[in-house]
Amino acid sequence: MQRRKFTISLLSGAALSGLATPSAQAGSLLSSLSEGDAASGIRAALERGAESAVGLLGKTDGFLGNPKVKIPLPGVLKKAAKLLKATGQGKSVDELITAMNRAAEAAVPQAKELLVGAVKSMSVDDGRKILTGGDHSVTDFFSAKTREPLGVKFLPIVTQATEKVALAEKYNAVAGKAAGMGLLDKKDANVQEYVTGKALDGLYFMIGEEEKKIRKDPVGTGSDILKKVFGSLK
């Protein structure tokens, strides 16, 4: 019964508010969907994006082996890394970069519970925005609902992984000075917080990649409900 009310509110609310873009196309879509399809399609897209991102990133080389999300040293520290490599400390630099990415890979599986929780708590307004929004509406939904609590959850895992590397302490010392001189963003002045932020960026980026696939080729997903809901938007 609750699901029925959700769907009726979603369909009628979107039609009345004119939130669709373009409105005529979205209005036609919303009126053509059978009861329950809208909510089911949106939840399926959310779940698919979350599971895909966590599965791809939360494993060995999920970050380190993917150039799109690999975590590098931040700007000004790349220059310091070059100096270290020139003095024979290249191995230490590589160890730090590897540790940063391994930390992100270890943290990402912890995201699944919160992402699933966000899907279950989706409101009627959230549903409207996702269905009639732009190409990144699923990604934006997850980021808005989970970024802060995931950051809290990721940080201890990242800290535990990076503190094993001696150069991490030097990173914080050098980065702290660089931030004090305005050469580095303050949020990047601590290796643990920097990696946590980049891990979240990578997670939402990969959710976005899956969202693009769903919107571009809903038939190719092999899901009848995704094909019906998102295929009608094309």
Describe each region flagged by the PLM.
Residues 34, 38, 49, 92, ...:
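Helical mechanochemical/support elements of P-loop NTPase systems and associated helical scaffolds
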Residues 1-14:
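N-terminal secretory signal peptides and thylakoid transit peptides that target proteins
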Residues 90-161:
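Mid-length scaffold segments of soluble, non-membrane domains
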Residues 27-99:
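N-terminal Sec/ER secretory leader and immediately downstream segment
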Residues 157-198, 202-203:
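An amphipathic alpha-helical core segment
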Residues 53, 123, 218:
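Residue-level signature of catalytic and energy-coupling elements of molecular machines
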Residues 202-234:
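A cross-kingdom marker for long, charged
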Residues 21-26:
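Sec/Tat signal peptide C-region and signal peptidase I cleavage site
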